[in-house]
Design a protein with these regions (language model features):
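Alpha-helical structural motif
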Residues: 4, 8-12, 22-28, 117, ...
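A general structural-boundary detector
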Residues: 46-49, 108, 126, 154
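Short, solvent-exposed segments of well-ordered alpha helices
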Residues: 49-53, 112, 158-161
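Short alpha-helical patches at coil-to-helix transitions and adjacent helical residues
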Residues: 56-63, 114-118, 164
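Histidine/acidic-rich helix-loop-helix segments that form or flank divalent-metal centers
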Residues: 84-85, 122, 126, 130-183
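A contiguous pocket-lining binding segment that forms or flanks enzyme active sites
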Residues: 82, 94-130
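A short hydrophobic/aromatic micro-motif that marks alpha-helical segments and, especially, helix-coil
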Residues: 73, 106, 146-147
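Acidic/His-rich, divalent-metal-binding segments that scaffold phosphate/diphosphate chemistry
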Residues: 1-102, 152
Length: 183
């Protein structure tokens, strides 16, 4: 509902302010998220949360799940939770402006970029705020092995050196394939 979406939007903004509020450009980032219609985009055209506001809900699901993984799993106990939160909230920013509403009410995804969406999100975010190395790695590698076989050696090294990246990937998979699956 509209009320639920308003509450989700407020929660998202509160968490984003908590994560990046003191960084140069954070207010510009908040305004850009409004302008690019982040809060009304679907999360996917074919799979999870193919509805207006789906990207907002997905980003919150990933953020909540990632923080819970940091809290409950010893493997993530030493993660920089601020980096995890920042990366979780912003990992799919590049999806904005790429969905076309179809006559049947669904969406078609149109991506003309030559980069993967991890890289594209990192580049777009850094137009407004500086990301830490951990945030960059987490966002860049959040797709895990879905980026393709050529990346598998590097992916393993990234996850060994940056548990924040593995945490974000796991949270994204839990949100996408468990929490957001229609029954």
């Amino acid at each position: 509902t509209t009320m639920d979406k308003a509450l989700l939007k407020e929660e998202y903004k509160r968490l984003l302010r908590q994560a990046v509020g003191d960084r140069t450009g954070s207010m510009a980032l908040m305004m850009v998220l409004e302008e690019v219609d982040f809060y009304n985009c679907p999360a996917s055209a074919k799979h999870h949360l193919n509805v207006p506001g789906g990207l907002l809900l997905h980003s919150l699901n990933v953020a909540r799940t990632a923080l819970e993984l940091c809290e409950k799993m010893p493997q993530f106990a030493k993660c920089d939770t601020n980096a995890v939160l920042t990366a979780a909230l912003l990992h799919d920013v590049c999806k904005t402006g790429k969905y076309i509403k179809k006559p049947d009410g669904g969406y078609q995804y149109r991506d003309t970029e030559l980069l993967g969406h991890g890289e594209e999100s990192v580049i777009r975010i850094q137009n407004w705020i500086h990301l830490t190395d951990k945030e960059i790695l987490a966002i860049r590698w959040h797709m895990g092995a879905y980026t393709g076989e050529r990346d598998w050696n590097t992916l393993s090294k990234v996850y060994d050196r940056c548990p924040e990246a593995l945490c974000l990937h796991m949270a994204d998979m839990i949100a996408t394939h468990i929490m957001e699956v229609e029954k």
